[in-house]
Amino acid sequence: MTEYDGKKILIWGYGREGRSTEAFLKRNSAPALIDIYEGDRSGIDEDKYDLIFKSPGIRMDEDDPKYTSQTEEFLKAHGDKVIGITGTKGKSTTSMLMHHVLSECTGRPVILLGNIGKPCLDYYDEVRDDTIVVYEMSCHQLAHTDVSPHVAVFLNLYEEHLDYYDTVDRYFAAKAHIATAQRTGDRLYVGSNVPHIDTYASVTVIEEGREYGYDLKIPGAHNRYNAEFVYRVATEEFGCSDEEVRKSLSQAKGLPHRLEYVGAKGEVTYYDDSISTIPEAA
């Protein structure tokens, strides 16, 4: 028996995450009804359903307890095992580095999922008592959530997605959900350019603009800054040694389109950094 048994459920949005939600519900429970809907909210008969799964990116301006998401449901079940990583830029690289280092240094199973094209409910059944989950979290996945991960990493905040959120304050409020529901005993690692977040977690501020002395395959001071978050989480939360974390970081490879080495001709070296879509990322 699960909490979804016998319920009438609507999946709002049928992209990758919507299809994943449908598969999860059919695999793990026995709802009385599963409907799919891809239109505007005005077309939803909310009284017909007990629960509505909203896909990321579908705009909803106010909270409603009848609405939930993959992120919300995953955190309810496994939030104590999750390292959530967000930020305007750097979250994919940091998530990759975190997964690599913890896989090398802890001896525990580590799952990488989330905003890298891996819907969390696809991995729901793989989480065990000793599992570590590295969850890349977008603003859309965090918006309207009422649960936060045990360890939160908030790298930075710049102006982005204002076509969706209208103001930086609203954009920040969506991302801040990564920490606003944290409790005593939880941890928040936050970049120095991120505004204050009200949280019960213990807070560690990582200074942006400093030079962090990590030997990485991936170039850029911003990646050494990202590596500082990984180092602090690995050593402070999981007891990894300085030597093993630095060695693991030095062996990690980068991601496509993020200062990816292309080649050299003469005295000119070429990198593909096409993922940089705002000036601060360039």
Model regions and ranges:
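Conserved dinucleotide-binding and phosphotransfer motif residues
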Residues: 28-29, 104-106, 236
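Phosphate-binding loop of NTP-binding sites
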Residues: 23, 43-49, 56-187, 192, ...
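Residue-level detector of alpha-helix initiation sites
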Residues: 16, 89-93, 224
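Nucleotide phosphate-binding/pyrophosphate-handling subdomain across enzymes
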Residues: 24, 216-282
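Active-site flanking residues adjacent to catalytic metal/cofactor-binding acidic residues
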Residues: 12, 34-38, 114, 135, ...
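N-terminal leader/targeting and accessory segments in enzymes
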Residues: 1-69, 73, 255, 277
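Beta-strand->loop->alpha-helix junctions that form or flank phosphate-binding loops
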Residues: 37-40, 68-73, 191-192, 200-213, ...
